[in-house]
Amino acid sequence: MLNNKSRTEWLQIHNRAAREYINSQWSREILFGVAKQRKKIFNQASGDVLDVGCGYGMNFPFLTQAKSITGIDFSSVMLAEARESMRNAPFKVDLHEGDAEALEFPNNSFDTVISSLSTCSFFDPIKALQEMRRVCKPDGKILLIEHGRSTWEWAAKYQDNHLHQQIEMGGCRWNQEPQELVKEAGLTILHATRTLLGVFHTMVLSPAKDG
C-alpha cells in the first residue's frame, strides 16, 4: 500500500528508525512545541486511558487524571525503551506489543483513547482510527496530536516532493490530512487547532456511535 510495501517491510522501517526518532526528541518536543501540546491536550484524559502507538512513552507523564494507563505499539524497539523509561515512574503502565488496526480489547473498553504523531505511520490509518473508535466508550473521547500537510504552499510542496524519502527513512506520510482521515473514520471533531505553519493538529474527538 505505502510505496508498495508490505506490513512486514513497514514494521522493519519503523524498528530501524526508532532510535533516531527517540534521539530527535529535543527538536520535536521543545523546538516544535510538541511537549507543550501534549501537556495541554492529554491533561484532559481521564478514567481508563489507552495510548495507541505509545512509542517510548512520551505521553505517559501528561496523563495526570488517568485511573489506569494502557499503551500499545507495534515496534518492539519503542516498547523496550518505554519499559526502561517507566522503570522508576510513580505510576504503572500496562504495555502491549500489537497492531493498532486490530486492537485486542473489547468494544467500549476505555474512557479515553489517545494517540500522538502516529496516524502518519499506521499501515492503514483509517482502520486504526476506527479501532480507536470501537474500543472507546460511547460517552468517552479520543484525543489526538497529529501532523500533516502544511497550509503554507511552499512548505506543502516541499513535503510533497520529499514524501518518498520520508517513507523510506522513517515510515512517515508527512503530507497526509489528519482531519480528513478522522472524518473518514466516522469520528466527530469537537475541537481542533493547527500550529507551526498548519502542520501540527490537536483534536478532541467524539466516537459518535449510532444508537
What are the language-model segments listed below?
Residues 112-124:
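A short SAM/SAH-binding and catalytic strip from SAM-dependent methyltransferases
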Residues 126-138:
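A short glycine-rich, Lys/Arg-flanked "PGG" loop and its adjoining helix->strand segment in the class I
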Residues 202-211:
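C-terminal lobe and adjacent flexible extensions of AdoMet/dcAdoMet transferase-like proteins
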Residues 68, 139-141:
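Short glycine-centered segments of the SAM/dcSAM-binding site in methyltransferase folds
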Residues 50-102:
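Class I SAM-dependent methyltransferase SAM/SAH-binding core
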Residues 1-46, 58-59, 81, 158-160, ...:
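Conserved class I S-adenosyl-L-methionine
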Residues 8-9, 25-28, 143-202:
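C-terminal alpha-helical "lid/dimerization" subdomain adjacent to the S-adenosyl-L-methionine
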Residues 101-113:
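A short acidic, Gly/Pro-enriched loop at the edge of an enzyme's catalytic core
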